[in-house]
Each structure stands twice: as C-alpha cells, then as structure tokens.
Amino acid sequence: MLNINTALRRLHESRKQIKLGLVGAGQMGKGIVTQVSQMKGMSVSIIANRSIDKAVQAFLLAGVDREDILVANTLSEAEQAMKGGKYVLTEDIELVTKVAPVDVVIEATGVTEIGAQTALKAIYNGKHIVMLNVETDATVGPLLKKMADGAGIVYTGSAGDEPGAIKELYDFADAVGFDVIAVGKGKNNPLDRDATPDTLRDQA
C-alpha cells in the first residue's frame, strides 16, 4: 500500500485508469463506488447487482450523472457503452468478468456461492480479483488463490474490512519480531470466549 497515491496520480496524469468491475451494490459495494469516485487513476465502470435500482443509486451517490448510466444485457452492449465513457449496470455477473475494459473484479455480495462463481469466472477470463466477500474467502479462498496464482493473476482481500485489518496487524507484529500466537475477532463484535457454532447460529 506504500506510495499507492503516487502510482495512481501518475496513471491519472498519463490519462490511464484501472477499470474496476463491481459485483454487489449493497453497503460495502456502495462504499467502494463512492470512495473510488474520489480517487485518481481508478474508476468503477460496471456494476452487476440483482437490483438495478440499487446499482443506479450507487453511481448517483458517487456523483455520476443519470444520463451517463446505461443498462447492458449483452457483452457487446457493455463494451460499447464503456468505450463511450458511460457507466454500465447489469444483472449478469458474467458480464463483469468478461467485459474487455475491466482490469479488476471486486466481489462484494457477501454470498458464498456467488462469490466463488464470480472469482472462478474472473480467473478464467484473466481478471484480477479483490475479494470483499469474507464468506467466500473463508470457505474456498486458499483454493481460489492457488488457481489465480496458476493463471498469473492477483487474488487478494482488501484493506479496511476486519480480515484485511487483522492481516495487516499480524504482518506488522511478525515483521517487528513478535511471536504471534493467535489472531481473532475485531472490535465490531463482543468477545465471547465460550462461543460455539450453536450459540452463534442465530446471530450469523
């Protein structure tokens, strides 16, 4: 993450962008769209979501003009719209993983099966993956990482959410010589040392 601001600024100055495709326009997805809209050198260009209205709202909250937002149902429609500088919405996840201008697919649905399917399609189509879907990552993340490595693409979690934040803390503690014996839950949930799957089932 060091010097990412400089790298993105250089991309912007050379009139280039990292094109992002987002799957899932819920709370985390909307946050991604809004945050990226404030950054140089990156752009969320296409969103796949079950509800097109939610995806529209994500772009509108980020300051995109309504007339610049188009719905696409086919690969050719999506690519033509993006080449014309439009922001694309679709209900078809596969479009996000196939559309040529997209460099990176961000998975933010929170649904295990959808996350796995999205990552597999991204790998098959040579797209890098940022997995915000901790449910998928905890279930099949190591397998997806191995497949992505074999395909020569990046599979990664994200900074900011609890799993990424815990990993950053672990890496720092390990680097400065601490013997880390355990990592655990972040501050958002109460610590229950006696928790079992049965006692947490209703909360989950």
How does the language model describe each region?
Residues P142, D149-A204:
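Core active-site phosphate/anionic-ligand binding loop and the adjoining beta-turn-alpha structural block
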Residues R50, A72, E135, D161, ...:
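Residue-level "edge-of-site" marker
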Residues T109-N125, L132-V154, S158-D161:
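Rossmann-fold NAD(P)-binding glycine/threonine-rich loop
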Residues L89-E91, I106-E107, M131-L132, Y155-S158, ...:
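General beta-strand structural signal in soluble alpha/beta enzymes
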Residues P101, G126-H128:
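Glycine-enriched alpha-helix->loop->beta-strand junction motifs that scaffold or abut catalytic
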Residues M1-A119:
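N-terminal glycine-/serine-/threonine-rich beta1-alpha1-beta2 phosphate-ribose binding loop
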Residues V33, V56, L120, P142-K146, ...:
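Predominant activation on well-ordered alpha-helical scaffold segments within soluble catalytic domains
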